Regions:
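Hydrophobic-ligand binding "helix-grip"
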Residues: 28-29, 36-43, 56-103, 111, ...
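Hydrophobic ligand-binding cavity/cleft-lining segments
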Residues: 1-48, 102
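Short Pro/Gly-enriched beta-strand edge/turn motifs at strand-loop
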Residues: 20-23, 49-53, 75-81
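A structural signal for short, well-ordered beta-strand segments
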Residues: 6-8, 53-55, 108-110
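Hydrophobic pocket/interface hotspot
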Residues: 17-21, 27, 53, 70, ...
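A conserved amphipathic terminal alpha-helix motif
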Residues: 114-149
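Compositionally biased, intrinsically disordered linkers/stalks adjacent to structured regions
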Residues: 93, 108-109, 124, 136
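Amphipathic alpha-helical protein-protein interaction surfaces
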Residues: 23-26, 62, 102, 123, ...
Length: 149
């Protein structure tokens, strides 16, 4: 149902930004509406880093946890995320990192549908705004952590 994307040019090293996105256990420190996170499994399989992680997302009376399958392709500089369970009918996230001089162009695409049709309608109306807030949070975190790199 909702599908959106954002693209940002961030004045940080590509590898540091990838490390930031893969640090799922740190998300509650800076991602809006992320209340908790946990990495259950992390395996380096050569060209692929594979993780299984939970995120608890909430605002107001709404709160839910979903489990994700996260795969980082080192050769392509792409992170793909799919849901395994939780309130989502499906979730497909795609992060792409491209070096641009001393900066990195980060593309973040999200496509998802909630199992609850009412919540799905509510989310559709504010989805791009929420995605922009998440992208802002990653950019601000990168600027804070890697300012002098």
């Amino acid at each position: 149902m909702p599908k959106a994307s954002v693209k940002r040019l961030i004045g940080s090293d590509k590898d540091k930004l990838i490390e930031l996105v893969l640090a799922v256990d740190k998300y509650p420190e800076f991602i809006p509406y992320c209340l908790n996170s946990k990495i259950y499994e992390k395996k380096d399989q050569g060209d692929i880093i594979h993780m299984i992680a939970d995120l608890t997302i909430g605002k107001g009376i709404f709160k839910d946890t979903y489990k994700s399958d996260v795969n980082y392709n080192k050769k392509k500089n792409i992170i793909l995320v799919k849901n395994l369970d939780g309130p989502l009918k499906y979730l497909n996230n795609r992060w792409v990192f491209v070096e641009k001089g001393k900066s990195t162009e980060v593309s973040f695409e999200v496509d998802f549908e909630l199992k609850n049709k009412f919540l799905n309608i509510l989310m559709t109306k504010s989805f791009q705004y929420g995605l922009d807030k998440i992208a802002d949070a990653f950019q601000k975190r990168a600027e804070k952590l890697y300012k002098n790199i």
